[in-house]
């Protein structure tokens, strides 16, 4: 990316914008707020393709020691964030520039949506001062992403950056997990505000956690059915892995000596050669 390109609508270059950032500890830019908020949510890596609308986020990530994985296509970045979330159980994060950067990532976000994967998609946008004026790569990202995310919104002020990231991250884990989209206009990212005017939620604050406990009587009845069955079999699906219940599931299968079939993300928790691993028969 050429950081010396003029910003949309004239004005300073991207490199000039960064050079003008205050060094005072009493103020902070929107991009640095993004990085601090991501750090508070446990994010240690972002997947992205470098773009002018989001450059200040990179500056903040460097200061917060958040790893930047710069790929060659935004679809790859979205799929990588999805894969990261599935393997770690933590929040995956993809950052894209405005317009085609956002739309290129849609297939990966749609995959995360159907797979119930907690992915936060942060997207750039033209400046608020140029809203509806045909600024560079301006698209209705929030409306486009709404059908394939659990939460889709735009940050309209720098002071709200951190708490809206916390809100979007919370939605990724509330109930059935899934992706959230947060659009942040360029001037919101570049603007500096007083640290005292910023709301910085505590790490994981208000993070909902729901677990299906089940009725004890039903669980006891199910156990009796399994023990008394003549030819039982168990089908294990994706939630066994996403809920990190695979160790208990394997212990159950082996303790009761019951064959198990695996679907979705549960495939692989037992190796194909295991005596309790049964292959499906398709016609």
Question: Where are the regions that the model predicts?
Answer:
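N-terminal alpha/beta PP-like core and its mobile active-site loop of ThDP/TPP-dependent enzymes
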Residues: 2-283
């Amino acid at each position: 990316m050429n950081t010396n390109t003029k910003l949309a609508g004239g004005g300073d270059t991207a490199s000039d914008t960064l050079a003008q950032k205050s060094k005072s500890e009493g103020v902070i830019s929107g991009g640095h707020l993004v990085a601090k908020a991501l750090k508070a949510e446990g994010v240690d890596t972002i997947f992205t393709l470098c773009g002018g609308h989001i450059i200040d986020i990179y500056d903040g990530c460097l200061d917060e020691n958040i790893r930047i994985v710069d790929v060659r296509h935004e679809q790859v970045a979205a799929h990588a964030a999805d894969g990261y979330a599935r393997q770690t159980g933590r929040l995956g994060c993809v950052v894209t520039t405005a317009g085609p950067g956002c739309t290129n990532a849609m297939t990966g976000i749609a995959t995360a949506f159907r797979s119930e994967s907690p992915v936060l998609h942060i997207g750039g946008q033209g400046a608020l001062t140029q809203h509806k004026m045909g600024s560079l790569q301006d698209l209705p990202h929030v409306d486009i992403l709404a059908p394939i995310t659990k939460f889709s919104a735009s940050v309209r002020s720098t002071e709200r950056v951190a708490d809206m990231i916390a809100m979007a991250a919370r939605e990724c884990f509330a109930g059935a997990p899934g992706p959230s989209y947060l659009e942040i206009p360029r001037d919101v990212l570049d603007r500096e505000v007083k640290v005292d005017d910023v709301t910085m939620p505590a790490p994981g604050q208000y993070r909902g956690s729901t677990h299906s406990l089940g009725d004890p009587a039903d669980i006891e009845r199910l156990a009796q059915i399994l023990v008394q069955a003549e030819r039982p079999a168990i089908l294990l699906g994706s939630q066994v892995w996403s809920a990190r219940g695979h160790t208990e599931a394997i212990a159950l299968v082996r303790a009761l000596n019951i064959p198990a079939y695996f679907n979705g993300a549960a495939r692989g928790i037992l190796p194909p050669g295991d005596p309790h691993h049964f292959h499906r028969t398709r016609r």
